[in-house]
Amino acid sequence: MPLYEGGPLTQFTAFSAGVIPNDVFGVAINWFVNRTPLVSRLPKLPAGSPQFLVTNDNYRPRSNPMNNGGALSSAAASVTVADATIFDVGDVIQIDQEYMLVTGTPDSGTTTGNVLNITRGYAGTTAATHNDLLPVYLVSNSRTGAEVNVTSVSRIPQAVTQYCQTVQHAYQVGGALQADANYVTGFATPLDRDRMLAMQHVMDDFESAIYYGKGVPISQASSRPLMKGISNLIQTNNVTSPTNAAAYKPSDLVRDTLQASFNGGGNPTVLLVSTDFLSGFAVWGHAAMRLQAGSNVFGTPIDLFEAPFLSGISIIPAPLLRPGTVICLSDPEVRIRLKRPMIDKPRGSRGDAFEGDIITEGAIDLDNEAHHAWVTGVTAFAAA
């Protein structure tokens, strides 16, 4: 049944990825599955320290600009690029219509700086003069079939430090209020009202930090660590002033999210959208269609949509996202790391009052930031 699909589509993965939530967290994950979709639906894995590293793999780019200091003449046997470390001996490169063979690189010890030794007019093309700053395209590497002692191309992953954040909200209720029975709404909650309010405040704060946290480390005893949110973890495809922001069209959405994620090497599966995008889909003539994603244990349907022009991409409305915001995720690379799953810590009775705290500690873990996209600043929508 749909409840057991993978990805941040339902709350099932929150229960089945390494951390078994205790009772109060299980209640929160289910009760707030639509209000706080990432906290509720993403897989949960343990974190054993106040901070951890988020890994961004660093593969060879397919192009690099010339940095020759002038035009490359048709007779030149070397070229300077912006970053020669991405190239290897035997690489076939292309500038304009000319193909060239790389015969020497800094890593092989045959050149220095960012200089490449090249064979001109390779593969039947003609050597020509090329203007500086043109892109140097990496076509492919080609070997003789009997080479030895090949020097590897080292691409060291980028590691970003993420900080576990503690969120804590108290509930305090007097005995007289606890004894009142005529103010409760007909929509019952799993726990008493004050405890549920504290639980919602914790879930709201944690979800909002996942979006907008800036990152504050532990530097002294009085530090208040803050996780880095998705808006700060995503650097490559982070759009804050989108083209056509006041007349945003479906093509703009695809360009800023899906296309950007694919270009970065990702496999986008989910769009998390602010609620105004639901109106945007209607303006575009592609109203979001609800999918049957099951319901939580309390019988509430789980919000999950698709739009006709985004077939196969799940759309999840996120009430706590600011207007004009959309997040595109390659969901297998996103998870919640918990140092302390949500706990209910009663302080007990004090006089004629009952008190306690709802506490959780953790952070978002998002691998390979170039595989995802963040867009904000959309102010109005226009038909395609």
Where are these regions (language model features)?
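Short, flexible loop/turn elements at secondary-structure junctions
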Residues: 106, 122, 275-277, 319, ...
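Alpha-helical scaffold segments that mediate packing/assembly in large oligomeric complexes
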Residues: 154-253
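Hydrophobic, glycine-enriched assembly/anchoring segments
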Residues: 2-23, 46-55, 304-306, 314, ...
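Extended oligomerization regions of viral-like shell subunits
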Residues: 50-64, 244-342
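A structural detector for beta-sheet-dominated domains
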Residues: 55, 75, 80-82, 96, ...
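Cys-His-centered catalytic/binding microenvironment captured across papain-like cysteine peptidases
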Residues: 7-16, 99, 108-175
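Autoprocessing Asn-cyclization modules and mimics
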Residues: 4-129, 382
